[in-house]
A protein has these predicted regions:
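Active-site proximal helix-loop segment of RNase H-like, two-metal nucleases, encompassing DDE(D)
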Residues: 138, 208-230, 241-243
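A short, amphipathic alpha-helix used for macromolecular contacts
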Residues: 1-40, 80-81
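Residue-level detection of the helix-turn-helix DNA-binding "recognition helix"
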Residues: 35, 46-50
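C-terminal domain-tail junction helix/linker
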Residues: 100, 230-274
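Extended, low-complexity cationic-aromatic segments
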Residues: 69-156, 259-269
Length: 274
């Protein structure tokens, strides 16, 4: 196939939409539109790494202090202060105690584990967690709600657990309970505590979110619990086992490289990146 037809195919894929109202092209619709075989269309899309069937979501930061906060948090990860413990702290709310209406079907040769679509709700809990950047260990506590009272209670648990000769640097998000006046008052009386807020809409900067993903996938999503007490017990057991073989998440991205990637994304959005 000549270069002109290849260019026509690529241009149509990138800059037009199907006439039938579809949101994106497929190899079948491109083949029908251009008269090129499906296998040839697929081969050229693969060669140019064009994937019209896929989409990725994004959220641009709106925080006026985005760069300052980014450098602050990334600096903690790459160059943690001496005589201090860096903790990534957050809560995972709405952990549901769901009881399946039928026993799970075990996995077997040729078929996966089966769970019923129906379930009985037995309430929710909030999982508070503090992940150590140094060694990956997690301090966790399940609480009935996620108000400032529960957050402050968890900070007290951290304060008792961390040696008094160490400063505590906490990476947190901008949830209202983290900035409550009573939380501020408690922190003001403890000079060893330092709070570092990630930029708005940038929870990906908080390493504890990675742990939340792990525990959700491995211990919560596919489980069945008859009560919040049973769910709490399962979470506590998972955290205990996790800490026996925990390893830190290794942060490698410098602040400048993140900002460069963001600039490229903005260029794509405005059309200057092509």
């Amino acid at each position: 196939m000549g270069d002109e037809r290849v260019a026509e195919l690529i241009n149509k894929t990138l800059h037009t939409k199907p006439a039938d109202g579809s949101t994106h092209w497929s190899t079948r619709t491109l083949a029908g539109e251009t008269g090129i075989s499906k296998s040839t269309v697929a081969r050229y899309l693969q060669a140019f790494q064009i994937k019209p069937h896929r989409v990725e979501s994004f959220k641009l930061p709106t925080d006026a202090l985005f760069i300052e906060k980014l450098r602050d948090v990334v600096g903690l990860y790459l160059n943690p202060p001496e005589n201090a413990l860096v903790l990534c702290v957050d809560e995972k709310s709405q952990c549901q105690a769901l009881e399946r209406t039928q026993p799970m079907l075990p996995m077997g040769l040729g078929y996966v584990e089966g769970v019923t679509h129906d379930h009985v709700r037995h309430g929710t809990i909030t999982l508070f967690a503090a992940l150590s950047v140094l060694n990956g260990a997690v301090l966790a506590s399940c609480k009935p709600r996620h108000r400032h009272q529960e957050f402050l209670s968890f900070l007290r648990e951290i304060d008792k657990a961390v040696s008094q000769d160490l400063d505590v640097h906490c990476v947190v998000d901008n949830y209202a309970s983290h900035k409550h006046p009573k939380v501020h008052a408690w922190l003001a009386q403890r000079p060893r505590w330092h709070m570092h807020f990630v930029p708005t809409y940038s929870s990906w900067l908080n390493q504890v979110e990675r742990f939340f993903g792990i525990i959700t996938d491995k211990a919560i999503r596919r489980g069945s619990s008859k009560s919040v007490k049973e769910l709490t017990k399962k979470i506590d057991s998972f955290v205990s086992q996790y800490n026996e073989n925990c390893k830190p998440f290794v942060w490698t991205a410098a602040a400048d490289s993140i900002l460069e990637k963001l600039a490229r994304l903005c260029g794509r959005i405005t059309g200057t990146g092509h």
